[in-house]
A protein has these predicted regions:
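Signature of the first transmembrane helix
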Residues: 4-69, 95-103, 134, 169, ...
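Hydrophobic alpha-helical transmembrane segments
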Residues: 129, 158-206, 227, 376-382, ...
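Transmembrane alpha-helical segments of multi-pass transport proteins
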Residues: 126-129, 378, 427-483
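Interfacial segments at transmembrane-helix termini and the short loops linking adjacent helices
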Residues: 106-130, 301, 318-350
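Helix-loop junctions and terminal segments of transmembrane helices
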Residues: 57-73, 149-150, 208-209, 264, ...
Length: 486
């Protein structure tokens, strides 16, 4: 099982690396073609796409959990297919509702929230309404992708995600070079959602066609809706806490200043979203093995160490060389205000990567209600941190608030998983200790050391992580994953 999950995770990571590479190439071109202000608006549109987890009311994730657990229990594929296609129909219907809502709210967002006027306001309004038209297609696509993940078709997903990533960024870049109008650039981004839907529904129909005469049971539909209902709370609050800071900043600062926050955030989030991508492979496996604690322990132990040895060296190197990398990638004037933002965000992104483990564990066991309640608890705390942080430290304060909120989220998730999963307590406690050591090393190297000593210790930590990663790969290939413990 661990070997299969590792292979699925590698396919996911490969697809994500292609997407990251395309984004790294596309953003400087968009900055040159559109300017900082319009690029800031484009990143806000990307933030709205990040709210797709809200729009689908948690049903795509519910499909992943339901499909994997049902097939693991030997349920009929015909019954599973009937449920899947019914839920995808519901998702398309929800998409029409959200289309109308965003179309109606777009003038308010442009005028009141973003405080735009003139040509910029016209372009942004056009782009937001184009984005609204794509929502039904996007939601149907997320349902199909969630089902394919439940079927553990990660190789198929990754192979198709690679060319689709080229289209997702390539089409907006092409439009920006021809016509530097951010409205049309966002419309190009929206058009790619239609292509995504056609692709994923075609693949799903090939693997899980609906059989005539077979209908979804009320019990299965009720379970999916209940799971998705609680998950929709997390999917509302989760993206809100990830992306609300940029909209709050947009209400206080001009778009060019917001870009100093959103560009490093989006880039760092994509660069370190590989663990989250890997967790997409872990989630259906945990749902399938929920009745076998020893198998879950092995999977989580492997995933815990993988997060530390793969993510820590990345965030550490980027933080140490943040100013140089931003200057080379964009320009020196942009690197100045963006560097402290990026460094603070990186430690938060590391903790967020580690928090996906208990999050996936709780949801694989059907406890989406607990993750939702934790997010409800965190939301007012984050709101206070954001307002106070921005008041005292400006854009850098937003990065500090986000990182502190992520640290709280990780602590609450690990404690909740430890409290509920008695057979996994020792493994979870060891994992938390490992995370504390990793965070201490990051803070020491980035903020306490300078010059040659900083570079030497960075090199030592990167080398140690590489050695540990190679050892993990060797053990996994040999099938001796039981030896891997945090």
């Amino acid at each position: 099982m661990s070997r299969k999950v590792a292979h699925n995770a590698l396919w996911n990571v490969g697809g994500q690396l292609v997407s990251l590479g395309v984004g790294l190439v596309a953003l400087p071109i968009l900055l040159h073609a559109l300017g900082a202000a319009r690029l800031g608006v484009f990143t806000l549109a990307l933030g709205l796409i990040g709210f797709s987890g809200l729009f689908d009311l948690g049903l795509s994730r519910a499909l992943t959990q339901t499909v994997s657990s049902s097939l693991g229990l030997g349920r009929s594929r015909a019954q599973v297919a009937a449920l899947v296609w019914r839920v995808i129909g519901l998702l398309a219907g929800f998409g029409v509702f959200w289309l109308v809502a965003l179309w109606w709210a777009a003038p308010f967002l442009v005028d009141r929230l973003f405080s735009l006027s003139g040509e910029m306001a016209r372009e942004t309004l056009f782009g937001l309404r184009a984005l609204a038209l794509s929502i039904p297609f996007a939601l149907a696509a997320t349902g199909a992708m969630g089902t394919l993940e439940g079927l553990q078709q990660f190789r198929l997903l990754s192979l198709w995600r690679m060319p689709m990533s080229l289209l997702q960024f390539g089409l907006p870049v092409l439009v920006a070079l021809i016509r530097p109008d951010v409205g049309w650039v966002i419309a190009a981004l929206a058009a790619t959602r239609v292509v995504w839907m056609l692709l994923w529904l075609t693949q799903l129909h090939r693997l899980l066609p609906r059989e005539p005469g077979v209908t979804a049971s009320r019990a299965d539909l009720h379970h999916a809706l209940r799971f998705g209902g609680w998950l929709s709370v997390s999917n509302l609050i989760g993206p809100l806490m990830v992306y609300a800071d940029r909209f709050y900043l947009a209400s206080l600062f001009p778009p060019a200043m917001v870009a100093y926050y959103t560009v490093p955030f989006d880039t760092a989030f994509r660069a370190t979203s590989l663990p989250q991508t890997a967790m997409n492979a872990l989630f259906p496996a945990l749902a399938e093995t929920q009745s076998r604690p020893e198998a879950s322990t092995r999977l989580l132990a492997l995933a815990m160490r993988a997060v530390v040895v793969l993510v820590l060296p990345v965030v550490l190197v980027v933080a140490v060389f943040a100013h140089l990398l931003l200057a080379l990638w964009l320009n020196a004037s942009f690197a100045g205000p963006a560097t402290p933002v990026l460094q603070l965000l990186l430690i938060g992104i590391f903790l967020n990567s580690a928090a996906h483990l208990p999050y996936a564990l709780l949801q694989a066991h059907g406890r989406s209600d607990l993750t939702a309640k934790l997010h409800l608890l965190e939301l007012p705390v984050f709101a206070v941190l954001l307002v106070v942080g921005v008041h005292w430290f400006g854009i850098t304060g937003a990065a500090l608030a986000w990182t502190l909120r992520v640290a709280l989220d990780a602590a609450l998730l690990y404690f909740t998983a430890w409290w509920l999963q008695r057979p996994l307590r020792l493994m979870l406690a060891r994992g938390v200790g490992l995370l504390c050591l990793a965070c201490g090393a990051f803070l020491l190297v980035v903020y306490a050391l300078h010059g040659q000593l900083q570079l030497v210790l960075t090199g030592i930590l990167v080398a140690a992580s590489a050695f540990a990663a190679l050892r993990m790969l060797r053990l996994t290939r040999l099938g001796t994953h039981t030896e891997i413990t945090p």
